[in-house]
Each structure stands twice: as structure tokens, then as C-alpha cells.
Amino acid sequence: DDDYHYPSVKLEFLTAFSGADGYLRSVVTDEGETLPVVEDKTKTNIEANALVRVISNYASEVTADGTAGAVLYALSGVLSVVPQTVDKFEEGVKTDPTDVLGIWMGLDYLNMTLIVKENGEHKFHFIEDEVIVDTATGCSEVYLTLYHDAKEEVVSYTRRAYASVPLRQYAAEGIQKVMVHFSVHTYSGDIKTYDFVYNPD
């Protein structure tokens, strides 16, 4: 039927919220739009009344009462943990190489798509190297490094990994601007540092 229009499906990082039954009830886009979940085709179930960071193929759909909602077609969890200082890593800090396919600011998060060698288990976290707060100017600087434990570095092909650094904890009272410096050890042997400005509302 020529009149059929396929839904306009987007692939984006979202923050998803569950209801009392653990099923996803709403999502917030990185543009700050809150959308009720009209249908979750993945039937994802998480802890009750919780939030989780995801990457999802979804489409906007007008709900019965005329408001905008979301239909979730596919969904994957995104590593999103609050950065820790070096002393909190009991087995020491690991910075095995990773390549960054993309890195950008979202809403209260620094998002990234990483390329890793496909060799079984990879452990990621975020290392908080230093935080400098200047209350006089209302600015702070945050230095972070990607923690990556690649286990056995065998061969072969690569895959993508998705991560999202929560930044809200750096928006202390009186802080209007946070300079974020995020460093990654790459396969070429270099350390790449990405600089972003986070303006908490």
C-alpha cells in the first residue's frame, strides 16, 4: 500500500524511567524532552521506580490524548556509573586501549561510542583524576580518564561499546560552568583528551 508510512525511527541515547512494576514508563531525550512510553517492544524490565541509561531505536508517536509518546523498537543498556577516585579501584587502575568513534555532550551526561577488540569481557568505568572548584567564578574543572580492563588481548574483529558519564554530581551549588576533560588511551599508543563545557541548568 503506497499510503503506508514507515515510522521515523531514531537511534539515540535516552534516560529511561521504570514504574512500580519495573517496566519502562517514560524516557527523556538528550534535548530534554520527556516522552511517555506508548509501547516497549523489547519488554525491558528493570528495578522498580529506577532510571537507566540506554541507547534505543525509537519512534515518536502521538498518544490517544494528542500528546507525544515513544515506541521503543530496540534497546541496549549503556554503561553509566559515577566516576570514582583512583583509591576506590581495589585492583588498581586499568587503562587498556580503546578507540573513540564518537563523543558528545548530552543532557547531564557525556556520551561516547567506543571501539574495542572483540575478545570476551571488557570492564569499563570512569576514573576521577582531579576536580578543581572555583566558587568565586562559579566554574569547576573535572579531569576524567576511561577505565578499561580488556582481560586477554586476543585478536580479531572489533565491536562497539556505549558509555555515558553522569555529570550532575559536579553541578554543586553556585557552579554555573563545568569544564570536562576526558582522556582515553588509544590503540595507537596515544592518550587523547576531549574537552567539553557542561552548563548545568
Segments and roles (model prediction):
Residues D149-M179, H185-Y187:
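Short, solvent-exposed, Trp/other aromatic-anchored flexible loops in extracytoplasmic proteins
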Residues E33-V38:
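A short macromolecule-binding patch
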Residues Y58-T67, A172, F182-T193:
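Short acidic/polar inter-strand loop motif in beta-rich domains
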Residues G19-V27:
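Short aromatic-glycine-enriched beta-strand elements
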Residues D1-A20:
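Bacterial Sec-dependent N-terminal signal peptides
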Residues V62-I115:
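Surface-exposed beta-loop interaction hotspot
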Residues K41-S56:
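Short nucleic-acid-contacting surface segments enriched for D/E, G, S/T with interspersed K/R
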Residues L101-E153:
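Short helix-loop boundary/capping segments
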